[in-house]
């Protein structure tokens, strides 16, 4: 974002008209022509990988292949992978916007070989694409190779070095040996690893290149000498002792930053100057009221320090909307936990930049989704399919944060000058500043809210000053911004850094820990306080083998281990068996119950839970001896009810997605014998007609008696490739079970129990629909016997109601409507009588409550149980009875006791003289009642939420009139 974003030193290859879509497609087609399978991008949420918060590299979806635990039906692949780097080692958040090339969300182009080609082909094809196909100047390219590592016992990668010289025209002076930090890749402390070979480009002008050779600037973070492509040669397996063993199969893993490559090929100095970001920047410029960027199609803001914050803000928001929209499209909703909190932090960071720097005070981020989809909806169709949902999710978050953002910024701005004032001061100057802070009533009020550990003003002042002298914002301030105003800590740190201040993170984290401890203590009542003893072995052999998919009874199980569980005065036991038909609670499905028969003695299994690899059966008593065969029998009737509800959940999930959209993802569930509960991502309430449609569609699938198709031990990637639905945030193993009811209707990864055909369910009925969190809805429903009982109960209710109305009408809806009409008529008569009574009271009311203020008659008083409508209707009568030279104020507390109302009247002669206006009076009165109001100069009304203040407010009317007259 400068006056001339074109880089004149790449004109031989640069073509501003070459679109990012063409470049992306050209990369994929180049490798497809060389036998590579074009693979779609994986989700930003890694499938079954609990070690990653977000997908942050192209290799994530192929990790199982490198580890030797998975396979693909192809040995060569090419893709563009959505990536997000916002946490841990790979965290680019702080750099975003402050330079011209870091991003939170980015695309990684890559080509892959799984035991197929190796270094020679990877090097040759990289050169062919960059130089021969895309036309990059060869004399601007540098290659790096691994210099070796004594700690690993590795010599230099002479093979790669020689290949760069033999497969390309690169001279020796532009092939550089680099250390392991730059040129050796490891998946972790152990596992697949190998040397890297990188391609760098020198974009500097000729005079700069002559002055300093490019080889001296490789890998030193020079903005114009940058890495373009990393070729990783995976050929070793790191051992726990630090040694490296050669792999049987050698792999190639390459990664090219798409945004950076587009900038080079379009001849732009910044990735933000490319066509990937231009529509987003222009959309912001069009909406911002700041004159220096409005109307500038090319956004060429003056290059001076004054406008640097504007440039940073534009870049930050353009970057962040991509991360936010793509994350939501992949099922990550902004929240206070895990991945959701990361997205909420990014979103609030963007809103703050827009609000404070671009002066966008209304929700604006959601409006950037449309230009984003226009640019990227083609290769990533999930964006376009979920556009409305993404926009709703973002707007809801914006509106929520904007409610507190302005106040939080005012708080920050009020306190920060005092922090900077104390910086590096002592002695008399410090005493003077303490005095000034003490006199700043607003700042002191804020500090008293922040420093909750003391109410001593001197303690607060001196604690604040001690921290501030070091140029540090106190942790108490940061915590209040977080806890009261919703400021993520990294946003507060960013705002502090803009003022050259640090944040007292130790103090902040102490307060956060204390808050979490309080939350844990408050929920202790809900925590299992059981005293669980260690498992005691009973017999050796295989244990906890689940066979419940195929049978409900195991006649000859053996007890492998037991333990005692004490809860208060209650003692229970948990039993582990060799084989068991009992399903342990998982995936929302409750655990099985049933019996364990030890010879002639039976004990009830009250619950079944999983603990690691163990399946624990809870019983109240434990027979002796335990070393004989045990018959394990599931309560078959209860199991059947659970199966019906679980399969109904799958059918309903499929219909929800079919009806509401692909954005619907499961967020939680309960599958019990008597009901099901299902939480899913969706913003709007599901109306009654839509619920009935979904219900009918599920019942149609039940009537079709669709048979269950079950596939066990399926490689997870194969299952996903078939189109199976994986539940968001669920952790899966490498091999999974797939439950299908018609491949075109419902196919899910699932470990639960199901009916053999949908007809066994019988019936499905919704019970309720509502909201449980922002963007998350909940439905409750019943199936099978429970649904039949629910329908019977509804019919019984209707029958009783029909009996009640039999004398009125044979049609129940018409009878109810007739009663409602009569009720409304009588209510109207009651209202009319009440208002008549109030009107009759006015003469007495005026006589008893009149006072004189500077020759003006002022009448105030209460007419309780009068509504706002009552007061407004009486107001005109009141005014007419008072006549000239009079002011009247009537007050009332509503029937619910929660609100107070006032109506004010001012005679025409007083209005004409300009002495008094009813609207001015109720403005003050409404404010004193905790609300507001308005109206005409002669008649106005107000309301508020502080009914207890009404008498005081009315008593103050004469003084208010006197003040207005003066």
From Swiss-Prot:
SMART domains: tRNA_SAD (SM00863). GO terms for cellular component: cytoplasm. PROSITE patterns: AA_TRNA_LIGASE_II_ALA (PS50860). GO terms for molecular function: alanine-tRNA ligase activity; aminoacyl-tRNA deacylase activity; ATP binding; tRNA binding; zinc ion binding. It catalyses: tRNA(Ala) + L-alanine + ATP = L-alanyl-tRNA(Ala) + AMP + diphosphate. Residues 927-949 are annotated as: Disordered. Keywords: Aminoacyl-tRNA synthetase, ATP-binding, Cytoplasm, Ligase, Metal-binding, Nucleotide-binding, Protein biosynthesis, RNA-binding, tRNA-binding, Zinc. InterPro entries: aa-tRNA-synth_II/BPL/LPL (IPR045864), Ala-tRNA-lgiase_IIc (IPR002318), Ala-tRNA-ligase_IIc_anticod-bd (IPR018162), Ala-tRNA-synth_IIc_core (IPR018165), Ala-tRNA-synth_IIc_N (IPR018164), Ala-tRNA_ligase (IPR050058), Ala_tRNA_ligase_euk/bac (IPR023033), DHHA1_dom (IPR003156). It comes from the Bacteria. It is found in: Cytoplasm. Zn(2+) binds at residues 646, 650, 750, 754. Its EC number is 6.1.1.7. GO terms for biological process: alanyl-tRNA aminoacylation. Belongs to the class-II aminoacyl-tRNA synthetase family. NCBIfam families: alaS. Consists of three domains; the N-terminal catalytic domain, the editing domain and the C-terminal C-Ala domain. The editing domain removes incorrectly charged amino acids, while the C-Ala domain, along with tRNA(Ala), serves as a bridge to cooperatively bring together the editing and aminoacylation centers thus stimulating deacylation of misacylated tRNAs. Catalyzes the attachment of alanine to tRNA(Ala) in a two-step reaction: alanine is first activated by ATP to form Ala-AMP and then transferred to the acceptor end of tRNA(Ala). Also edits incorrectly charged Ser-tRNA(Ala) and Gly-tRNA(Ala) via its editing domain. This is Alanine--tRNA ligase. It comes from Salinibacter ruber (strain DSM 13855 / M31).
